[in-house]
């Protein structure tokens, strides 16, 4: 172990207050409420409200995805270089919520200008909003190992965060379109901008509430430390096998999750002729909240690695059960719920465990590059995996002869089954393989924490 830790933490093994836990969870309520509103309805707004062509709207969203894949590690480097009296991550919850709220709301305003001007405006406003969201989401993940060194407390905090995220999505799904109709009074353009402003105000307020109440450890020392050079940030990845294995597993998982969630509407519409079930199916996914809350209790008898692997295997099994359900709707709904319970657990675990990869890097190399390690392990995996998952789904269906807005051939229906069931199920199972090699590193967690506390004392 290196005798010099260039970015140190003091002992932080005590449990945090209920207020800090609630505040940490509120960050994901804030982020998901506003960002998911944009990601869910922006395409419809562009094409059916602003009048932008589908092809141009697709290019805008594709460019945003490309930028998303680039800006996550950049934000990680920025966080590693941040030095303030509030710490490394916490100040961003003061500096960014208002700009993020403003540009997210502006994304749902279409100025009365030429169509080319509208497209340029849409691209700029949406991309800036996406960049600012990454700027908030990256420190949200990176602050966890800076709040506490306790693996147990990190797991509890992460459960609060993931529950908050699900609440944010649930609130958005339940209120977005009713608010558009009510606030717009028949004018969709007015309805969307007023709804976006409403969500933006709530999001900004919740983020500032979290900023007020959460704390990083040892901010006085961090404030006066030299900034971590970019070269050393990347050096923290070298030989950090826990981090490498988690990044690989998490990236594969997000490809699978996005592919499954993107194609459920196609499966219900074309294979079962039950498009009316889409709202019900989407709302039932929130049942996973109950199991996310229970993760700290599972951890009392199971290693975190096995909880993550178990979630992936349950998600795989749920996919197989959906295939067996065929046109039995009750069986299908039960299998969908089961699959979402598994994916909900698997989605939660990386956020709780990436802090250990940061600790491992500090223990092994003497470099604690919290920002870039967690940016790659969380935000990059989510955004890149989601983009690849959507692309893979489209490629699979297209290769089987899928034709939009038409009755599908037998081959087209088979392609939807592969895109919705078999490819995600195989990828969920594949994501578990790197974790089989991770367990031996998790067994070192207490020793590493003790060594870091000794060095920093």
What does each of the following model-derived ranges do?
Residues 2-457:
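Membrane-embedded alpha-helical bundles of multi-pass transporters/translocases
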